[in-house]
């Protein structure tokens, strides 16, 4: 369970977030959505601890985020930012291995987890290749494997306390096949009890994998609810100033946005 209570954020005197309160139950998938500059990434950074809120609190499993020791939270929460710069000629396997630093599980177990995480993101064949020579989509998949490996114990088992995965536009550089892969991964780990919070722009992709949506604009939460409640023509027009038709997907019945 993750909750934000009346979060406000000011950076260099500029207000970025105002009175944001959301609740994300254990094992849920929440999509943060809205136009560019709405505050989605800023909220994710406050939740992760990268930014310190100017007001309000973040509670994780009933404890204030500041009450978690860094080694403890590193085993429980992983963050995939929009972009990650890495200029060292590590192999893909070595990049994923960085995420096991907080753990004390031994080399044999860590190598097993690294291999499983790379396999999950369809990147086993990249294991020995230089990370800096990979394509953008390949790099993103390796980084996805890295954050999965960081909280692998929570992804693998139905643990009592879950785990949290924060993803900032994770599908931005993925082709269609790997967008589908991402949906399947999110569904699998959330079933295991991991709470997933994602910044997303693709409404149809969000409809496939999210349990709840949080629409943001100008640093405020304008609406929070389930996919059927919020993915309506009226809401899309209100949030994005775009006229769209919303039907039902012929296979799974999820909302289907047609521009």
Please state what every model-predicted region is.
Residues 2, 17-19:
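Conserved structural motif at the start of ABC-family nucleotide-binding domains
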Residues 64-78, 88:
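ABC ATPase NBD coupling module
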């Amino acid at each position: 369970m993750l909750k934000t209570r009346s979060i406000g954020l000011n950076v260099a005197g500029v207000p970025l977030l105002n009175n944001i309160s959301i609740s994300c139950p254990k094992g849920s998938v929440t999509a943060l959505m809205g136009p560019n500059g709405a505050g989605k990434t800023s909220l994710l950074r406050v939740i992760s601890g990268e930014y310190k809120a100017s007001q309000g609190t973040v509670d994780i499993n009933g404890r204030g985020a500041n009450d978690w020791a860094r080694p403890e939270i590193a085993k429980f929460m992983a963050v995939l930012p929009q972009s990650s710069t890495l200029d060292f000629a590590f192999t893909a396997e070595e990049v994923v291995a960085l995420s096991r630093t907080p753990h004390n599980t031994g080399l044999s177990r860590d190598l097993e987890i690294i291999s499983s995480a790379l396999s999950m993101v369809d990147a086993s064949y990249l294991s020995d290749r230089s990370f800096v020579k990979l394509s953008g989509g390949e790099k993103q998949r390796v980084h996805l494997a890295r954050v999965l490996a960081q909280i692998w114990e929570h992804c693998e088992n139905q643990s009592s306390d879950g785990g949290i995965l924060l993803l900032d536009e994770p599908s931005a550089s993925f082709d269609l096949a790997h967008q589908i892969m991402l949906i399947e991964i999110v569904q699998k780990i959330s079933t295991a009890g991991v709470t997933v919070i994602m910044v997303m722009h693709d409404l149809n992709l969000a409809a496939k994998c999210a349990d709840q949506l949080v629409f943001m604009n100008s640093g405020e939460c304008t609406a929070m609810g389930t996919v059927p409640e919020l993915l309506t023509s009226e809401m899309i027009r209100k949030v994005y100033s775009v006229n769209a038709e919303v039907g039902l997907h012929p296979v799974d019945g999820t909302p289907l946005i047609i521009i």
